[in-house]
């Protein structure tokens, strides 16, 4: 199976081009004002025009108001929503759009395999479950986590697609793919020169490392 890849936190046209040319399956825009990678709907709409057919656009939110999500839907027309805060199943499903639900593995209540699996099951209609590491703030932490916490999710026959995040970069992504065998990866800071400024070289290195593992697994 080929591991899908989303490059998140894009803010520049040239970085979208780098991600697409390297073979990314999806790109992500962050609509969380506290993030250094935040873009507003108008800017995201401009960037979205650089995304070709068959590359998905994902809109990331953290505890948004409904009108904030609607503005993104109207301006950007994302293919997928991603909720990275404390959103309930009702919050995530109210827009009638496909969505990813992110879980911060290691957070209180999510610090055991059983606890994490139980939380995930509340979002059975999600298109995928994304797993990031826990930190005091919201959004991506840029740090890894104990992948053993995913054991309950991996053993669940009703599991949704597993999307792995958390400190992934060209130097560790191959080991992460071998250990977890996720459906997809979500990478941001691990392919950056600075927050919101992606490195074309790091993106290429990341994609090459993933491809090398996928080829062996066939």
UniProtKB/Swiss-Prot annotation:
Entry's Gene Ontology BP terms: L-tryptophan biosynthetic process
Known EC number: 5.3.1.24
Top-level taxon: Bacteria
Reaction(s) catalysed (UniProt annotation): N-(5-phospho-beta-D-ribosyl)anthranilate = 1-(2-carboxyphenylamino)-1-deoxy-D-ribulose 5-phosphate
Gene3D superfamilies from the UniProt entry: Aldolase class I
Keywords: Amino-acid biosynthesis, Aromatic amino acid biosynthesis, Isomerase, Tryptophan biosynthesis
GO molecular function, one term: phosphoribosylanthranilate isomerase activity
Record-linked Pfam families: PRAI
Keyword Amino-acid biosynthesis: yes
Class of the enzyme per the UniProt entry, highest EC level: isomerase
Pathway note: Amino-acid biosynthesis; L-tryptophan biosynthesis; L-tryptophan from chorismate: step 3/5
HAMAP family documented for this protein: PRAI
PANTHER family for this protein: N-(5'-PHOSPHORIBOSYL)ANTHRANILATE ISOMERASE
Family in the record: Belongs to the TrpF family.
Name of the featured protein: N-(5'-phosphoribosyl)anthranilate isomerase
């Amino acid at each position: 199976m080929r591991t899908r890849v989303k490059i998140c936190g894009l803010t520049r046209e040239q970085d979208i081009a780098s991600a697409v040319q390297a073979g990314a399956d999806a790109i992500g825009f962050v609509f969380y004002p506290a993030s250094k990678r935040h873009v507003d709907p108008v800017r995201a709409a401009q960037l979205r025009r650089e995304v070709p057919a068959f590359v998905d656009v994902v809109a990331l939110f953290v505890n948004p108001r409904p009108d904030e999500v609607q503005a993104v839907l109207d301006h950007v027309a994302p293919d997928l929503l991603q909720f990275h805060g404390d959103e309930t199943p009702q919050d995530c499903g109210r827009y009638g759009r496909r969505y990813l639900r992110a879980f911060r593995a290691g957070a209180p209540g999510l610090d055991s395999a059983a606890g994490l699996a139980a939380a995930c099951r509340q979002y059975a209609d999600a298109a995928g479950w994304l797993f990031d590491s826990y930190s005091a703030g919201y959004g991506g932490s840029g740090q890894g986590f104990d992948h053993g916490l995913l054991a309950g999710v991996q053993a669940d026959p009703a599991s949704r697609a597993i999307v792995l995040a958390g400190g992934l970069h060209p130097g560790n992504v191959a080991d992460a793919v071998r250990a977890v065998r996720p459906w997809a990866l979500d990478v941001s800071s691990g392919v950056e020169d600075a927050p919101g400024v992606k490195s074309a070289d790091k993106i290429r290195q990341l994609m090459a490392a993933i491809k090398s593992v996928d080829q062996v697994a066939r």
